[in-house]
Curated annotation (Swiss-Prot):
Mg(2+) binds at D71, E141. One of its GO terms (molecular function) is metal ion binding. Allosterically activated by GTP, when glutamine is the substrate; GTP has no effect on the reaction when ammonia is the substrate. The allosteric effector GTP functions by stabilizing the protein conformation that binds the tetrahedral intermediate(s) formed during glutamine hydrolysis. Inhibited by the product CTP, via allosteric rather than competitive inhibition. It comes from Gloeothece citriformis (strain PCC 7424). Catalyzes the ATP-dependent amination of UTP to CTP with either L-glutamine or ammonia as the source of nitrogen. Regulates intracellular CTP levels through interactions with the four ribonucleotide triphosphates. It is an enzyme of class 6 (ligase). ATP binds at S14, I15, G16, K17, G18, I19, D71. CTP binds at S13, D148, I149, E150, K188, T189, K190, P191, T192, Q193, K224. CTPSs have evolved a hybrid strategy for distinguishing between UTP and CTP. The overlapping regions of the product feedback inhibitory and substrate sites recognize a common feature in both compounds, the triphosphate moiety. To differentiate isosteric substrate and product pyrimidine rings, an additional pocket far from the expected kinase/ligase catalytic site, specifically recognizes the cytosine and ribose portions of the product inhibitor. The keyword Nucleotide-binding applies. This is CTP synthase. Pathway: Pyrimidine metabolism; CTP biosynthesis via de novo pathway; CTP from UDP: step 2/2.
Amino acid sequence: MTKFVFVTGGVVSSIGKGIVAASLGRLFKSRDYSVSILKLDPYINVDPGTMSPFQHGEVFVTDDGAETDLDLGHYERFTDTPMSRLNSVTTGSIYQAVINKERRGDYMGGTVQVIPHITNEIKERIHRVAKNTNPDIVIIEIGGTVGDIESLPFLEAIRQFRKEVGRNNVVYMHVTLIPWIPAAGEMKTKPTQHSVKELRSIGIQPDVLVCRCDRPLQPGLKEKLSAFCDVPVASVIMSQDASTIYQVPLNLEEEGLAQQTLELLNLEPRQPDLSQWRTLVQQMQSPSKQIEVALVGKYVQLSDAYLSVVEALGHAAIATNSVVKIRWVSAEDLENDSAEQHLEGVSGIVVPGGFGVRGVDGKVRAIEYARHHNIPFLGLCMGMQCSVIEWARNIAHLEKANSAEFDRESPNPVINLLPEQQDVVDLGGTMRLGLYPCRLTPDTQTFALYKQEVVYERHRHRYEFNNAYRSLFLETGYVISGTSPDGRLVEIIELPGHPFFIATQFHPEFRSRPSTPHPLFLGFVKASVDYNHVSLDSKIQTHIELVTEENTPSIALG
């Protein structure tokens, strides 16, 4: 029978429940247990697809086209297991399903209430993950903070869940904060005590406490928490801040989190194999070189808006024994300032996805700068569309070339709406979403990186390259290195004679993993490292020449 671990959070939001859930999944997998992780989000949106990146951060897209919380990206990267739409549940989707059932008459005229109808639907979603993927263990992260009114139906549902499936098949894990108070010179447990008290008032007694802290727990603190929260000392787990999130599974393993949880579930503890993971972390912590890459985006004020891009760059950095320092550049700043002012000195430029006209001209200027100065460039989704616009304006000399998304009156809409999107009215869940095949063109840089003819990548867009301009682009030197299998949709472009200039309509960042960096990100980081060396050698040579000139004595001829 499938076992279930529920992860709740207390005291503050953004406590790190997602990383704890993902880390626990990694620890279970290292013991050869199959795992699936489910996120229950208490917001009323049906999914995060229409939410502002400034509020929610990145929208992570699964193979089956679900627009989900960024935590699902952590789940996939840590467990190396693909998630699906079943792994993301929101209050909005729960209420939508219940109301649809009521409209169909499924409740036979009964009064529809939070208990039992909403809670039953929540429990059904949890069971659905277990039935469809049949894992040994399902980890369920409950979004929000204990005490929030929005979380109450989910907490009531998981309270009922243990009674229905059996005490030995469920573990309640509570992630909480142990703050350090400088004035007192000590750590305080009172916030955690109150958080556990709040959980108990709902009918949930946590089995495991995961204590987030910025320094080691002081002597006696675990015993104190054990006494006041009625949790065994061995189940009070320290989770100290780490230099990288990939260190967290190793820290939690040292604290015995997986072993304690497996014992509570009556499962064999087994010996973990974390050798590969330890090697990855060691490589991250001992790089031999550093490069600086500019990320030119619309939402750079919140780095979580580009979380998977940042992680994919990090994965490639591990493989190249380097560290990637990101220079966050607002695309809007490039509309008013010179590109050189913001981009000088970088070894690579990434232009990621986005929606809407704001900042587009800044992205175009960044791409022009990369092309002119032979700086490695990687464009993603809108980044590819902007590279098409840049080429159309500056090389193909198409007057007022633009995307139909940004200028419906453009005489040269080199990016146009997909035909199947013409009659779409709703915004949520209606784009070209999920995994699609892409056929690569032989003898291209892209083909050399992937080393295969057909690849599968995740998409999230409504607009595509306008094929009315394909011949003109090819005539002016553009290379189309990837298309849909029928050749209709342009999916990848590149420029010959450039160290690295590749742009994709899809989002390769969603399929990158710490142990298997995505080929395009790996190629980009390698090219950026090479560019950095060439640039540094050039600067050294210039310095030598200047010094030589300054030290050359002047000779008077007469």
